[in-house]
Design a protein with these regions (language model features):
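Conserved catalytic cores of very large enzyme subunits
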Residues: 1-156, 177, 184-209
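Contiguous, well-ordered alpha-helical segments that form the cores/surfaces of helical PPI scaffolds
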Residues: 160-173, 196
Length: 209
């Protein structure tokens, strides 16, 4: 965060610098960009992150923020595998589109299956009111809860996550160059293009489902 640890003259920049050196060897800790435009209008005490996968802030079904919400189901796309199996860039996007569609279908299937499970499967979550609207479900018996879709009232506030691994390796395959700082810097736009391609699809599904 600017004025905290972002710039070299910030009070805690030394801690941020140390953290990045640790990340270079151990992949931890997890970072949160407090100046992210996606969360600028949300109470900073209600924003949360889950590892490297999900920023929990926006909510199309209820209250914004991370409180009483979580990742309901997740899936990861292996970008290098798709790139390695592609003959050219157009073929890559065609395969990526297919994999994204399959990922979406799998997540929806997981979500629907969870919502149909008997309420006893989520007793600890419900008794402690960990999820939004979970107090509604625990007041009813299993049959009533299932018939009234009470689990869905809780889980619909969660997130379905499509993650990915290996963006740098993916680009390396596509441009047929070894990974290096120069290769990464000269192909930043291709990297952004791939991310925009996936983001466009997930934004569409958020509105549709």
């Amino acid at each position: 965060k600017k004025s905290i640890n972002f710039d070299s003259d910030d009070k805690n920049y030394d801690l941020f610098s140390l953290a990045t050196r640790v990340t270079g060897k151990r992949m931890n800790p997890t970072y949160f960009n407090c100046d992210n435009v996606l969360v600028k209008d949300i109470d900073e005490k209600k924003v949360g992150i889950m590892g490297c996968r999900t920023l929990v802030a926006k909510n199309v079904n209820g209250k914004e923020g991370a409180l009483k919400r979580g990742n309901i189901a997740s899936i990861s796309i292996n970008l290098p595998k798709i790139a390695r199996e592609s003959t050219n860039l157009n073929n890559f996007y065609k395969k990526l589109n297919e994999i994204c569609e399959e990922s979406k279908d799998i997540l929806i299937q997981k979500y629907e299956a969870l919502c149909k499970l008997e309420i006893d499967n989520f007793k600890y979550i419900l008794e402690n009111n960990f999820y939004e609207n979970s107090e509604i479900s625990i007041e009813k018996n299993s049959e009533e809860a299932i018939n009234n879709n009470d689990m869905e009232k809780s889980f619909k506030n969660g997130t379905l996550s499509i993650g990915f691994i290996g963006l740098a390796e993916c680009v390396s395959y596509l441009v047929k160059k070894e990974i290096s700082l120069d290769m990464i810097e000269s192909n930043l736009e291709l990297s952004r293009e791939i991310l925009r391609f996936m983001r466009k699809m997930t934004d569409k599904w958020t509105k549709k489902y």
